Amino acid sequence: MKIGFLTILLFLVVQTAWGQFRVHSGMTVTVNCDKSEAPVVHTALELLQRDYRAVFSDSLHCEETRGNILVGTLEVNNAVEQSKADLSGLKGMREAFLLTVLPDGRLLIAGSDSHGTAYGIMELSRLIGVSPWKWWADATPMKRKSFELPSGYRNVQAPSVEYRGIFINDEDWGLMPWSSLHYEPWYKPGRIGPKTNERIFELLLRLRANTYWPAMHECTQPFFLTKGNREVAKKFGIYIGGSHCE
């Protein structure tokens, strides 16, 4: 009787452990992501790799073959549909994402579009303990030896506001001199360049924002006239607004 009970208990424990998603220090972890994904998805993956290294002191590898983590956008990566996961929460949604543990223990990060996929990747960074304010607030993440999500874990989220972001105001006394005199001193005064904007856009991406209204005071050179700004906005999937001075 006792042997039978222990056998059943052991079977249940093994089944539970098998269905978990688990990573730990020293483990080879691979992300399966198609090269045809949009730039914002690959940008988010680069941030995740950096975050993973900061938390586990290990590398996260990105490949197009089978991995511990499957990343993909609906109608871009066929592996998402082939995973047999319930994708109903993404259909017809804008910038939505799904994180779910598959029966074989892999983690699926899927998006209804490229922004949704990128936000799902950043959600994993948040779950392992990385703050969106990591750089701006010197919020260094705590080291961990392992991280796991239970069997059947499912996390579906979508924004309720279509365009979400910030505008830069009164840059004369803060952002502009800091950027052009200290953070990017190779630019002439009056320019807020791509290095500064990359830090701003990283924060926006981590916070799931998608829109930015640049500084427009007379002391500042226009956003699109500063070389590199357009490219960094595309890299982070940021829409640039022009209604600031209304």
Where are these regions (language model features)?
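Bacterial Sec-dependent N-terminal signal peptides
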Residues: 1-22
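Short secondary-structure capping/junction motifs at helix and strand boundaries
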Residues: 2-4, 131-136, 210-212
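Contiguous, structured surface segment used for ligand recognition
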Residues: 20-158
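Aromatic-lined carbohydrate-binding surfaces of glycoside hydrolases
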Residues: 34-37, 65, 75-79, 160-246
